[in-house]
Amino acid sequence: MATTVKELKATARPKSGKGAARAERRAGRVPGVIYGNNQPPVTISIEDRELRQRILAGRFLTTLVDIDLEGKKHRVIPRDYHLDPVKDFPIHVDFMRLGEGATIRISVPLHVVKSEASPGVKRGGTVNIVAHAIELECGVESIPQYIEADVGSLEIGHSLHLSDVKLPAGVKALTREDATLVTIVPPSGYAEEQKAAAAAAAGGAAPAAAAPAAGAAAPAAAAPAAAAKAPAGGDKKK
């Protein structure tokens, strides 16, 4: 599977520490770091506006990035970012450097599909997403943007497990196979309706069992004696 690689420009940050980071933010830049692949970490800064757009676009943590650091390319993947707790803008970002042919453990979002075709949803049930992401291990060139969870055949009360999901080639799940991903939750009052329907069915079956089978013959009348005896003391021939 081909993985999309985005480009991002960065500037080397010669100083580290809280004071230097605050100075970068005042200048409209977000401090960050590139680490990993048995190389020393490199402190960088990125334009706040550009980084914010990348984060808001979605799938930021599963997208490969080529960081252009003063003419030198670094193939990385975002591993974490921090937002200001009040103003909600990025204040720091971490990138992990990737070597050629490396494998990576990554959390990939779950994408539910065909919910409108689910028999359970058609009967008033609701799709309940239990796991919003799946932990995977794969090559850096095979990172899926998301994993599809097809719920088109689920009835009310049924669940979709990890073992029901087809993963792309070369991708291994780190979560146990029986993990529940999605369930179809019954609507309000569904249990009472089911009990009432079962009681009505049981009540209708009892009188039916007591009634005689259709077309059954009525009890036969007592058969007359095969040959009636002559009355005792009858007239004799003279």
Swiss-Prot record:
Do you know which CDD domains this protein is assigned to? Ribosomal_L25_TL5_CTC
Domain of life, source organism: Bacteria
Q: Which GO terms describe its molecular function?
A: 5S rRNA binding; structural constituent of ribosome
Q: Fetch the InterPro entries from UniProt.
A: Rbsml_bL25/Gln-tRNA_synth_N (IPR020056), Ribosomal_bL25/Gln-tRNA_synth (IPR011035), Ribosomal_bL25_b-dom (IPR020057), Ribosomal_bL25_C (IPR037121), Ribosomal_bL25_long (IPR001021), Ribosomal_L25_dom (IPR029751), Ribosomal_P1/P2_euk (IPR001859), Ribosomal_uL5_bac-type (IPR020930)
Chain segments carrying region Disordered: 1-24
**Single GO biological process annotation from the record:** translation
Q: Where is the composition biased (Basic and acidic residues)?
A: 1-10
Q: Which UniProt keywords apply?
A: Ribonucleoprotein, Ribosomal protein, RNA-binding, rRNA-binding
Q: Give the record's GO CC terms.
A: cytosolic large ribosomal subunit
Subunit (UniProt): Part of the 50S ribosomal subunit; part of the 5S rRNA/L5/L18/L25 subcomplex. Contacts the 5S rRNA. Binds to the 5S rRNA independently of L5 and L18.
Q: Which family does it belong to?
A: Belongs to the bacterial ribosomal protein bL25 family. CTC subfamily.
The function of this protein is: This is one of the proteins that binds to the 5S RNA in the ribosome where it forms part of the central protuberance.
Report what the protein is called: Large ribosomal subunit protein bL25
* Gene assigned in the entry: rplY
